[in-house]
């Protein structure tokens, strides 16, 4: 896999084709996800009425399902959207927000996975581990520090990808991405991502943008994660001593735009693992 060549081609397609990304997302981070989608070159639509799912999906290039503020009506819309997308050959990305903290979330996410409706899962270690084991025992939506050792995260990414026949992107201080056969380890990013709301949700949006223009879902997931990581590093470099998470979030949006319009691979050094 020549990632540098493939990433460059995908970024060019993303900026030129402006794919439509249908977000069925949570109300906490919806605006941030729409903004980051536009900055990367995509075109967001945030529809969640079950009655219009078929029509909306017909005009989309990727569907992103984010269960952060799940309810029964959204579940109907999300499952319908995923089913229509699969019929049309449109990639579906799942962000299993807080799946380890609620049996409702866990059961719904597993239902989508077991029906083979998902192409890529992007979540933190605790979320992906809960999906793999089928157990919810966490707290809130943030990843638990224990278990984020590289070996454990890599094991979870590979095992979950193999179990559910899709790509798993386990993101954290170090990112682990696998399709069950190949695995990538990425070291981009910045600690300030932990101090803003929606960094994971926005990463999932970037993954969806890349999936919309890609044939290889492993490459798409990796590129979305890389764009966020490089943008975070660049945004942090622009901060002054008086700045904090608020300024960082504004800079992050700017830097996603700059990273995808003035693409460079200087900081990209993924470790590939079999």
Which stretches of residues belong to each language-model region?
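Charged C-terminal helix
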Residues: 5, 230-274
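Active-site cofactor/substrate anionic-group-binding motifs, chiefly glycine-
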Residues: 36-89, 94
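Glycine/small-residue-rich loop that forms an oxyanion/phosphate-binding "nest" at active or ligand-binding sites
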Residues: 74-123
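Conserved phosphate/ATP/ADP-binding segment of small-molecule kinases
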Residues: 105-183
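Conserved post-catalytic alpha-helical subdomain immediately downstream of the catalytic base
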Residues: 197, 207-247
């Amino acid at each position: 896999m020549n990632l540098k060549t493939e990433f460059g081609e995908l970024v060019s397609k993303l900026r030129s084709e402006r794919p439509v990304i249908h977000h069925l997302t949570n109300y906490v981070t919806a605006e941030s996800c729409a903004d980051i989608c536009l900055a990367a070159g995509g075109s967001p639509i945030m529809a969640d009425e079950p009655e219009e799912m078929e029509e909306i999906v017909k005009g989309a290039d990727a569907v992103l399902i984010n269960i952060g503020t799940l309810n029964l009506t959204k579940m109907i819309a999300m499952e319908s959207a995923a089913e229509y997308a699969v019929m049309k050959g449109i990639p579906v990305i799942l962000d299993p927000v807080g799946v380890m903290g609620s049996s409702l979330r866990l059961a719904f996410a597993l239902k989508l996975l077991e029906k083979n409706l998902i192409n890529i899962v992007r979540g933190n270690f605790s979320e992906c581990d809960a999906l793999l084991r089928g157990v919810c025992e966490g707290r809130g939506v943030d990843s638990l520090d224990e278990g984020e050792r590289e070996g454990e995260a890599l094991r979870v990414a590979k095992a979950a990808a193999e179990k559910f026949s899709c790509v798993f992107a386990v993101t954290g201080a170090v990112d682990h991405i696998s399709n069950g056969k190949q695995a990538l380890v990425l070291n981009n990013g910045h600690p300030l991502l932990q101090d803003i709301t929606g960094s994971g949700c926005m990463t999932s949006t970037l993954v969806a943008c890349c999936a919309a223009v890609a044939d290889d879902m492993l490459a798409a997931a990796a590129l979305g994660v890389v764009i966020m990581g490089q943008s975070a590093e660049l945004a942090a470099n622009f901060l002054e001593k008086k700045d904090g998470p608020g300024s960082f979030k504004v800079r992050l949006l700017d830097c996603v735009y700059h990273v995808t319009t003035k693409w460079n691979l200087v900081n990209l050094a993924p470790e590939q693992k079999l």
